[in-house]
Regions:
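N-terminal leader/linker segments that initiate helical-solenoid repeat arrays
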Residues: 10-83, 95, 102, 338-339
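Solenoid-like repeat scaffolds
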Residues: 29-36, 69-77, 104-111, 136-145, ...
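Start-of-helix register in tetratricopeptide repeats
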Residues: 42, 82, 114, 147-149, ...
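Residue-level recognition of tetratricopeptide repeat
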Residues: 49, 89, 121, 154, ...
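Structural motif corresponding to the intra-repeat A-B loop/turn of tetratricopeptide repeats
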Residues: 54-55, 94, 126, 159-160, ...
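TPR-repeat structural position
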Residues: 57-58, 97, 129, 162-165, ...
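Primarily a tetratricopeptide repeat
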Residues: 63, 102, 134, 167, ...
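Canonical tetratricopeptide repeat
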Residues: 86, 118, 151-152, 190, ...
Length: 343
């Protein structure tokens, strides 16, 4: 899950069609307004993590960063660093983790809390908990204590699912009353994720309820869905998303995937959601999309069984992301493919 927003205001049944690299997953009405500042660009990128995202945020920010690059020498030191971090966040968003880290080397001598948080997040996704914790430790004295401590405990837990880390983090709940809403929301999201992974879905839902549902980032909504799945409450997921998602055409694929899983568990085999998801997956398969490889693998494991394809994308995902979740996905795909091959 991304932590950076805590400091700044992841066989097809659809009808086949020809694709090229201009084929889009989502569509939107063109926007005429350009981004005016780095501050605005940061806010827009953060907004892309929420239900109200229009789907064009990334494209708009890429245009903005390209323009700013032409003016790079005229920017002051602070502006240069913020631009580099913004560009690195774009790279992280498409799982180009090594490129993102190399990009951040441009500001190695002066790294803001935002840069350290981004590096910590990338290292967690790559399965390097030790390095992630080192990044988190550099936040001490540079940002709120709650953010620094949550970052460190989250790094530890990413490679060692021990209840002691949950207890350690829970002890600092008292500090949530003095931090900004975004920091508070992230703290509870981390607590929820830990609780769920330790088998306490009820506690996970309780932590997530500290934030109004529609104001949760999509990453937290995915945890919310998994918590309900653990309780066999699939109707809550399909109903919750049906009441909250403004447009499935621009909805996040991860969210659509959870929604489709909930529908299938209720015996719903055809729906607008599943049709849209199938179209999105077909395009991602054609592109061999590495940034959504985990979602593609899960789709072909749980929605439209195609185990060789699931394994292919689990292996693609593993080339970039090596958290415990990614390892488990790869093992699931290997086992499913082996069973189907030997059947």
């Amino acid at each position: 899950m991304s932590v950076l927003s805590a400091l700044t205001v992841c066989s097809v049944s659809a009808q086949s069609e020809k694709f090229n690299y201009d084929t889009v997953i989502a569509t939107w009405q063109p926007r005429q307004l350009s981004i005016a500042s780095i501050d605005e660009a940061e806010k827009i990128l953060t907004s892309s993590r929420y239900l109200q995202a229009k789907g064009d945020e990334r494209e708009r920010i890429v245009r903005f960063t390209n323009i700013m690059r032409q003016k790079f020498d005229s920017l002051n030191a602070g502006q240069k660093e913020r631009l580099v971090v913004l560009e690195a966040r774009l790279l992280q968003g498409i799982h180009k983790f090594e490129q993102a880290k190399q990009h951040l080397n441009q500001i190695a001598r002066f790294r803001s809390p935002a840069a350290q948080l981004l590096l910590a997040d990338i290292n967690v996704q790559q399965g390097n908990a030790k390095k992630a914790k080192e990044n988190c430790e550099k936040l001490v004295g540079q940002t709120s204590f709650l953010i620094a401590f949550t970052c460190m405990v989250n790094a530890d837990f990413s490679q060692n699912k021990d209840v002691k880390f949950l207890k350690k983090l829970s002890a600092f709940e008292t500090y949530t009353s003095t931090v900004r809403p975004a920091e508070r929301q992230w703290f509870y999201e981390v607590l929820a994720d830990m609780s769920l992974q330790l088998g306490n879905a009820e506690a996970a839902l309780e932590h997530l309820s500290q934030t109004e549902f529609e104001k949760l980032p999509i990453s937290a909504m995915l945890v919310w869905a998994d918590a309900h799945f653990a309780l066999n409450n699939y109707k809550a997921v399909s109903s919750g998303f049906s009441n909250s998602v403004p447009d499935i055409l621009t909805a996040d694929d991860g969210l659509l995937l959870k929604w489709a899983i909930a529908e299938r568990a209720q015996g719903i085999v055809r729906s607008e959601v599943q049709t849209q998801l199938a179209k999105n997956m077909e395009i991602r398969v054609w592109r061999e999309d590495s940034s959504h490889a985990a979602q593609v693998a899960t789709y072909f494991l749980e929605i439209e069984p195609n185990y060789p394809l699931a394994l292919k994308f689990a292996e693609i995902n593993w080339q970039y992301a090596q958290s415990l979740d990614d390892k488990n996905l790869l093992e699931r795909a290997r086992q499913a493919n082996e069973v189907s091959t030997n059947a």
